[in-house]
């Protein structure tokens, strides 16, 4: 039986999600199939029921199709581990890449076909192309919701202004406003989420926050101080990464004092935002799943003093 993880509601929707969401990105394509199956099965066993997938172009050079194999593989893995989609919140994204040649319903149906699913629990809208105004995008999403193949909708990396405009337009066309916004949020980057304009926009929509990039690409794990490999191994000398990498090393001291790891502590910070419903993570090992889940209980016992120390280390005021 899956371990119990706390759940939060996404905004004003009826959707309840585990406090940790597992993203797939292109991760599974880079792993041996057996390892990917074990990882997904372990995440489900630990109680993660919020799974994020999307259509990505192939970067391996070996996928049988140039784009969307990430979705094909995700669906195959779900079936291989015996997952019941109806018991999960599975999310995907509208990229609007082929707009207006492909509308929102067309993009959704293509993704569902590749995953071999009938329905999504959550559909995100990525940032809009210049030729797609917010009112038209919301009308497109209204048409998607009318199909019954999506439970709720949300946005990814939208500006506060566009989110506010979408909320107003949703009221005009009589659909629910976005229930969540997936935005970069970490000890290394708080500006987007903590901008007062974004807080106002989230409040107006009644939307939850889903932090992404919680470890700043792995920099906040502290592992690179020991020469570990990872996504940033080719960027360790990039000055744009230096602050996050230094912060990852600095987190070792407070993490040790709390009996945890820098990665778990960094994820816990994102869970403390009052609007956070779930923090989105990436993982390639069961240990990384455990570290993220440990952050849920850690967030519940961090004191105001602990948080003040973290913000001081990150030079956040």
Task: Annotate each language-model stretch with its function.
Residues 11-14, 45, 75-86, 109-118, ...:
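Acidic (Asp/Glu)-rich catalytic clusters
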Residues 23-34, 92-102, 131:
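Active-site mouth loops of central-metabolism enzymes
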């Amino acid at each position: 039986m899956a371990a119990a993880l706390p759940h939060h509601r996404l905004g004003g929707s009826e959707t309840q999600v585990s406090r940790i969401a597992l993203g797939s990105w292109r991760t599974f394509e880079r792993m041996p199939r057996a390892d990917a199956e074990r990882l997904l099965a372990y995440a489900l066993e630990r109680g993660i029921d919020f799974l994020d997938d999307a259509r990505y172009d192939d970067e391996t050079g070996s996928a049988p199709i140039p784009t969307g194999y990430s979705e094909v593989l995700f669906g195959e893995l779900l079936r291989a581990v015996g997952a019941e989609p109806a018991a999960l919140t599975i999310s995907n994204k509208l990229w609007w890449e082929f707009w207006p040649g492909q509308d929102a319903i067309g993009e959704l149906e293509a993704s569902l076909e590749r995953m071999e699913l009938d329905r999504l629990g959550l559909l995100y809208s990525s940032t809009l192309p210049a030729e797609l105004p917010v009112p038209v995008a919301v009308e497109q999403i209204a048409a998607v919701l009318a199909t019954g193949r999506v439970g709720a909708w949300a946005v990814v990396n939208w500006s506060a202004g566009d989110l506010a405009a979408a909320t107003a337009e949703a009221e005009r066309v009589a659909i629910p406003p976005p229930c969540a916004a997936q935005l970069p949020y970490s000890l290394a980057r708080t500006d987007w989420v903590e901008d007062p304009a974004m807080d106002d926009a989230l409040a107006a929509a009644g939307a939850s926050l889903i932090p992404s990039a919680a470890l700043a690409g792995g920099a906040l794990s502290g592992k690179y101080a020991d020469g570990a490999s990872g996504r940033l191994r080719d960027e360790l000398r990039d000055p744009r990464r230096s602050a996050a990498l230094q912060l990852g090393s600095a987190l070792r001291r407070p993490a040790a004092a709390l009996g945890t790891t820098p990665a778990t502590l960094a994820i816990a910070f994102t869970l403390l935002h009052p609007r956070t419903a779930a923090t989105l993570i990436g993982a390639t090992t069961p240990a990384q799943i455990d570290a993220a889940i440990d952050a849920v209980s850690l967030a519940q016992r961090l004191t105001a003093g602990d948080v003040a120390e973290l913000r001081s280390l990150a030079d956040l005021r």
